[in-house]
């Protein structure tokens, strides 16, 4: 199911007929800002527009592996407090790795995907909404095909590296934090006449670096999408020093 179909499912597009009465929501991978707000939004749309029963799966796919399945029945009371303003995910999450090769306590690895599929059916779910990054989406796509499950994926990654997605949940917060870090480094760099280096997350994607670097006034921004050399960086900093600029980021 595509994100366009998700919008239709949750009432943002054309009304469609369907038989879904019970859905689950889980968060997978690393935590980030915006997760609780996303879960809340899904719940209110599913409940208010379609009268669905909504279950929150605890600790990502690990919750579906547990017996009994670890879940929270979501209701209006769940979201009545300050949950919306809290970081992280109140459902819990996991980044233990691939459930097709799940690490066991004895050091071995085991395919536990059938347990996830069985947990889905044990709860009587008509569909599952997964909020996760590229790794989670890749894994859940395989599980959906294996078990013939109805799964919708919502992109969540501070790296913003999910294809065909302009911006993912968590990215904006990550850029704001990195920009604030650069702002804080400016005064120290100026006081000591030094070059300060800020390393940010992103793996093979430079979205955080380029956006925070521009917003925070970085003098040199290195991203994996573009080749660079140490000599090129040194030449740039030397040029700045020759112009009387004695500190840099």
Residue ranges and their predicted role:
Residues 16-28, 38-124, 135:
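A cross-family phosphate/adenosyl-ligand binding-site feature
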Residues 119-121, 127-132, 138-142, 147, ...:
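Accessory alpha-helical/coil subdomains and C-terminal extensions
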Residues 62-64, 98-99, 137, 157-162, ...:
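Short gly/pro/ser/thr-enriched loop/turn and capping motifs at secondary-structure boundaries
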Residues 26-35, 201:
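Short, glycine-rich nucleotide/cofactor-binding loops
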Residues 40-48, 70-77, 142-152, 169-173, ...:
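A glycine- and small-aliphatic-rich helix-loop capping segment at beta-alpha/alpha-beta transitions
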Residues 154-167, 190-191, 215-216:
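Acidic/polar active-site rim loop that often engages polyanionic ligands
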């Amino acid at each position: 199911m595509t994100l366009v179909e998700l919008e239709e499912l949750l009432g943002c597009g054309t009304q469609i007929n369907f038989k879904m009465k019970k859905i689950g929501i889980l968060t997978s991978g690393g935590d980030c800002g915006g997760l609780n707000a996303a879960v809340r939004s899904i719940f209110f749309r599913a409940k208010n527009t379609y009268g669905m029963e909504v279950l929150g799966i605890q600790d990502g796919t690990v919750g579906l592996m547990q017996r009994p399945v670890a879940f929270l029945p979501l209701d209006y009371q769940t979201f009545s407090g300050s949950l919306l303003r809290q970081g992280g995910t109140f459902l819990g999450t996991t980044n233990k790795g691939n459930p097709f090769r799940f690490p066991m306590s004895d050091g071995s690895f085991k395919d536990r995907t059938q347990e996830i599929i069985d947990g889905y059916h044990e709860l009587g779910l008509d569909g599952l909404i997964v909020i996760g990054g590229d790794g989670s989406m890749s894994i859940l796509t395989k599980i959906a095909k294996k078990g013939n499950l109805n799964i919708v994926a919502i992109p969540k990654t501070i790296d913003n590296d999910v294809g065909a997605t302009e911006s993912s949940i968590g990215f904006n917060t990550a850029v704001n934090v990195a920009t604030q870090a650069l702002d804080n480094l400016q005064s120290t760099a100026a006081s000591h006449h030094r070059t300060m280096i800020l390393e940010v997350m992103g793996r093979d994607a430079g979205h955080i670096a380029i956006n925070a670097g521009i917003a925070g006034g970085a003098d040199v921004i290195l991203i994996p999408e573009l080749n660079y050399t140490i000599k090129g960086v040194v030449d740039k900093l030397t040029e700045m020093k020759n112009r009387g600029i004695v500190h840099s980021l």
